[in-house]
Amino acid sequence: MNLISRWALFALLPCAAFAANDGYVGSNVCKTCHPDIWSTFYKNPHFISIASGKEPPERTGCESCHGPGKAHVEARGGKATIVAFSVLPPENVLDVCLKCHSQTLSRANIRRSQHTLNGIACNSCHSIHKSQAPRALLAKKQADLCYGCHSNVRAQFSMPFKHRVNEGFMTCTDCHNPHGAYAPTWRMAGRPRMVDQAVGNEEPCLKCHSEKRGPFVFEHAVVRVEGCEQCHYPHGSTNSRLLRRPVVFTLCLECHNGTGNGRQANGVFTQSGSHNMADPRYQNCTACHVRIHGSNSDAFFLR
């Protein structure tokens, strides 16, 4: 149908369609000029939830997001006469989405999230009309979507030892909350990570590695205070167990340096005087200190 014939159809519409409801014209009018968008939109969850006909015009169909369509119709189109998300500032896009999604998304958390603060709008990640991932209406598969901005993380997931995101065994959102988390930072690194709650422990890691949760009678302070990332990379590493160093003892000696049997001023145990670190027998610390994340039996994590 060409543009002239489309507009000819509007001449046949009842005047009441434009006169009532403060400029709301109904989604069937939108369908006349936007048949391609309509053909995909009516199949997705948004359409199902807002096109039931049980809600008032401002919460029904296309106009629940794009606003009253009368001026847009009378002007024969144009982004200046309708709520057009492609030109809307990110904070305004968020306001529109939160009209419905405020129950599932915390207004405070999402407004202070690093995505929002860096100008990432809802439609930067979500494809509202048509989506390759219908469950969350994502514009792409989740990992590909995240890699679009976080290319450095894509490289880490290609390392020999990594969390298996590319293989489909887990997703970015298993650890990260893209809409903002209760904890503004991932405590162990002190950098914004938008992860789920981290109250007293490293919750993103412990969701899977629950055996490391504790509490233990004898805590390894670096685990409890500074966190998992002090020893492990979170995404990928050239070292087994995602360790930050290729040899275990070099990692341990970053804290347990000095000689003699005792403690440093900060309370950290020094390297044992009986351990000759040039001897390969002493270079794999965890061969003896097997409960390195914490123990209920031994202060030196020997069992």
Regions found by a protein language model. Name each.
Residues 2-10:
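Sec-dependent signal peptide recognition
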Residues 3, 18-303:
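Short sequence/structural segments immediately N-terminal
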Residues 11-19:
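Hydrophobic h-region of N-terminal signal peptides that target proteins for export
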